[in-house]
Regions:
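Glycine-rich phosphate-binding loops of nucleotide-dependent enzymes
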Residues: 2-256
């Protein structure tokens, strides 16, 4: 197997006397979808916050593309190709749908403050490239005809797709989705599942936290199970649903 794009080694996070994440080891690979499941409060979102730099580990290290990113600030981690969404959708309500996606196109590599300030020819060319890219992404998620509308005009499921389109605009190598199906009805969840499946690419890895078992089991190449901050299992979806420790900790009698 190729080298992992993300390698988490012995990562622990304490908040006072609370052990939120306890000695987690994980490898994530390009072209794969890594599912992460566990009960509420298990440490899943804390793990995402550690990877994205919002929290710093108490112990352990995180490497991305072979580089130690453990102590980098969130914006530096983002620039290296790690992009995430959140449980609660975070869109710019006062910007159009198109402008929301264009925000994701801007990064340190292609932006020059003076070019933007004086609206130079180079800036205008770059802005047109960003607009074309944003339009292409909106077309992909079925929102191009609504590009000049405001995000609040969209139903919940489409707002979630818009948030993912904005994340994709920055060309991530690792896309982290935190409960993307939360609050969706059955039809919206089916459409989201198909959309996430369409995102699989040899050039990008996806990490997926999700409570909808049907979604996470149908999409994931591998599933990592956390309970009380500890890993209790890691295997294929087919094996995870048969694991007694997982059933006791999380799945219960739920039909998956």
């Amino acid at each position: 197997m190729s080298n992992p794009i993300l390698k988490i080694t012995d990562v622990t996070k304490r908040f006072g006397g609370i052990m939120a994440v306890d000695n987690i080891n994980m490898s994530v690979y390009l072209g794969k979808i890594q599912g992460i499941i566990g009960p509420n409060g298990a440490g899943k979102t804390t793990l995402f916050n550690l990877i994205s730099g919002i929290y710093k580990p108490t112990l352990g290290s995180i490497h991305f593309c072979g580089e130690d990113i453990t102590n980098l600030k969130p914006h530096r981690i983002n620039e290296k190709g790690i992009v995430r969404t959140f449980q609660n959708i975070r869109l710019f309500k006062n910007m159009t749908i198109l402008d929301n996606v264009m925000v994701g196109c801007h990064n340190k590599e292609n932006e020059d403050i003076l070019d933007a300030l004086f609206k130079t020819k180079r800036h205008k060319v770059e802005e047109q490239k960003n607009k074309n890219k944003a339009l292409s992404l909106l077309d992909r998620v079925g929102l191009i005809h609504l590009r000049y509308e405001m995000p609040d005009s969209l139903p919940y499921g489409l707002r979630r797709k818009l948030e993912i389109a904005r994340a994709l605009a920055s060309n991530p190598k690792l896309l982290m989705l935190d409960e993307p199906a939360a609050g969706m009805n059955e039809q919206e969840t089916i459409e989201l599942t198909e959309f996430i499946q369409s995102l699989k690419s040899k050039d990008m890895a996806i990490m997926l936290i999700e409570h909808d078992m049907k979604l996470v089991m149908s999409l994931s190449d591998s599933v990592y199970v956390i309970n009380h901050g500890l890993k209790i299992a890691e295997d294929s979806p087919e094996e995870i649903v048969k694991d007694k420790a997982v059933i006791n900790a999380y799945l219960g009698e739920e039909d998956v």
